[in-house]
Structures are given as C-alpha cells and as structure tokens.
Amino acid sequence: YFISIKAKRIACVVSAVIFVATSCVSPLTGFAFWETNLAYEGESIYNYLQVKNLSDRTILSTNVLFGVQSVTMKDKGLTGMYYDTALAAPALADNANSALILGMGTGTYARQLKQYYPKMNITGVEIDQKITDLAGEYFDEPADIPVTTYDGRAWLAASHDKYDVIMVDAYQDITIPFQMSSTEFFTMVREHLNPGGVMVVNMNMISDGQGSINEALSDTIASVFGNG
C-alpha cells in the first residue's frame, strides 16, 4: 500500500511514499539454498549470495531461505513484484528528471526506471561491491548508470545533490539497518529531495498492527515529512 506524507513545515511540498513489499507471499520467494538452477553461489563481506536462473527471469537471493533481493526479466516488462509499485513514484513527483537509488542491488529499480522513464538521470549507491559485480555479470545492469560502493547514509552526508525521486531499498529481507531508519536519516533524505520530490521506502515485512516495525517506521517518517 501507499502512504503519502507531505511536509507542512517547509516551503516546498515533499511527498513521501511508503510501500510494503508483498514478495514474501509470492511463489517466487520460497527460496531454499538447495534449489537447482544456480548460476552463482558465494559470499561477500556482507551477504551469502545466490544467483538463480528461472525460465523468465534471473533472481538474486541473500542470506536467508526465502526472499528475492533483485530480479531481472529476460523479456522486458513488469516483474509482478513490488518493484512495479515503486514505478508510481516518478508519476507522483512534480518532476521526473532524476532519481537516487540507495540500495542499488543488481539494478532492478534502475532497469525499470530506464524502461518507463528513459530520459531520467539515475544514480545508484550500493554498499556491497560483490552485488555490483554480479549485476554486471548476470543482471544486465545499465552501463550508463553510475554506482558508488558506499553506505547510503554516509553517501548522503557527503553529497550536495538533489533529486526528484529517492528510492530507499536498503532494507534487506527482514532486517533494517538502524542508521537508515532514524529521524536523522530521513531528514537527510528530505534535504536531498527537490521541491515536489518523492521518497519511496521498501519495507520487506507484512505487519501493520499496533507496535509493528511498519508502524514505528511510519511514525518516524511522519515526524520528518509531516502527517498531512
């Protein structure tokens, strides 16, 4: 689902969009390490990595027995997963000229944006260099998109650039990096958005009840962007 949050305390209107990934109920996400059709299996400093070839797509899975971290379609089109929902972000923004992806992975968001918004300038940040290497080898990551190997929050702290869309896809499986879920982090994101810009956050867990992680994260974002 989407929650639109617009700031009331700043001159420009900034929208924040949160959506919950439903991929953990998809038949594609019952992922076990003993499955066949593995194109690659290995480890990086951060992750256990598997690349799996399916008939219509190639997927990357990390660390756990389920979940899809990244996907590329063998025939261009929508994925049928939460990545498609995120494509609404540029349509919600006042402009759709630039995008920053924090948690580039193997470039799923970037490929989708390139396909449906071909004139958009895209910048990627990915902390795991091995995933970036796999992106070029197995996932047809667009060669014209610059990808920096760095922590997303640290990258924001060092950058002065602003964007129409910022996609936060650094929440891996069921874990959330604390440094990218705080009031300070979302304040930095807001400061890097152009007027009328949109932030998208992927929360990879289905839980929206009282006291849930979703509720806590939504409250944190609302404290920065406002409730209106």
Regions found by a protein language model. Give the residues of each.
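Class I S-adenosylmethionine-dependent transferase superfamily signal
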Residues: 113, 188-190, 221
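A short glycine-rich, Lys/Arg-flanked "PGG" loop and its adjoining helix->strand segment in the class I
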Residues: 181-195
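Conserved beta-strand signature within the Rossmann-like core of class I S-adenosyl-L-methionine
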Residues: 196-203
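S-adenosyl-L-methionine
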Residues: 132-160, 165-168, 172-174
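Conserved Class I S-adenosyl-L-methionine
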Residues: 212-228
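Class I S-adenosylmethionine
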Residues: 3, 17-138, 212-217
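Cytosolic-side transmembrane helix boundary signature
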Residues: 1-15
